[in-house]
Amino acid sequence: MKVLVINCGSSSLKYQLIDMTTEDALAEGLVERIGINGSILTQKVKGREKYIVEQPLKDHQDAIELVLKSLIDENHGVIKSMDEISAVGHRVVHGGEKYSKSVLVNDEVMKNIEACIKLAPLHNPPNIIGIKACEELMPNTPMVCVFDTAFHQTMPEKAYMYPLPYEYYTEDHIRKYGFHGTSHKYVANKVAEVMKKDASELKTVTCHLGNGVSITAVDGGKSIDTTMGFTPLAGTIMGSRCGDIDPAIVTYLIKEKGYSADEVNDILNKKSGILGVSGVGTDFRDIRSAMGENNKRAILATDIFGYQIKKQIGAYAAAMGGLDTIVFTAGIGEHAPEVRIRALTGLEFIGVELDEEKNNSHDIGEGLLISKESSKVKVYVIPTNEELMIAKETLALV
């Protein structure tokens, strides 16, 4: 069976066609600048040159039509006809409280995703457009929604409830939701597999460190707490997002600096975090270069990053009443040993012993153990594979 995985952004679309018998990606691609001048599709197939198509794409339906044409293209495709696609798995950012697992698409599901637009105004609308476009072009193919928020729906009330007037929860659904759930679930299951244990036996802290950052306490295979909150702005410092700050800073900036609410939102989401502290950028390769030149602000940003991750690991070890393993994943988690060493140094008291040589290795493979053999808490670097997780969840429903 082959599953097509679709991830729609506001003007972009990522896709993978996965053969579920081998769990290999037959093709993967990115469509950029949808609805903007200069639309472009880039498709990669192992062992072949990149296939690039530049043509006007007025909307996501045009983009998905081009994706399907590219997959069945005589010279550049990987399948003979669309009939070979057994199902389509769609990444949907926000499922609210309604969905704790993936679901087959129907009218009721679509209404519920639309109802969550106010909770994810930037992400859910393009997700909906992508589903509708696929339904139009592939009317007989089952569609499945895989929600970023679903994995965290196992959090207890004491973890997800904010100490605000209770009616904000009952009337406006203001609570912690958490994000990156598909990634956290994948690596929590993968580390159990690598350790030859069942996920239900492990207390794990998963650290998804990319441009967005979230850390999750996974107890017995279930999320019991996570750092992102009502929105993906909460938690630790990120590429350009501030993470947790004193909420009164918001009213201070509005009153004292004369900013509008939208301007403050822009500052906290796009001008803060590692970018704001370092003044260098959000790409960690640039931060690393600046650190090499002894840029004090770049060093400070990295120190803050490592310190906040360390605090969170300690907090979640306390919340779970123990810790068996820590997993680092995503772009920075997989490729920034200088962040990992800052996050792990000082955790010896809970049983973490880092092997510095392994930590500096670039050969991650399916999973790299970076703690010493004697370490009570095992620390791994595991590449995330959200697309494969979405495909697995899709296959389970069709």
UniProtKB/Swiss-Prot annotation:
Mg(2+) binds at residues 7, 386. Its EC number is 2.7.2.1. The keyword Chloroplast does not apply. The active site is at residue 148. GO terms for cellular component: cytoplasm. Its main location: cytoplasm. It is found in: Cytoplasm. HAMAP family: Acetate_kinase (MF_00020). Homodimer. This is Acetate kinase. It comes from Clostridium botulinum (strain Alaska E43 / Type E3). The lineage of its organism: Bacteria, Bacillati, Bacillota, Clostridia, Eubacteriales.
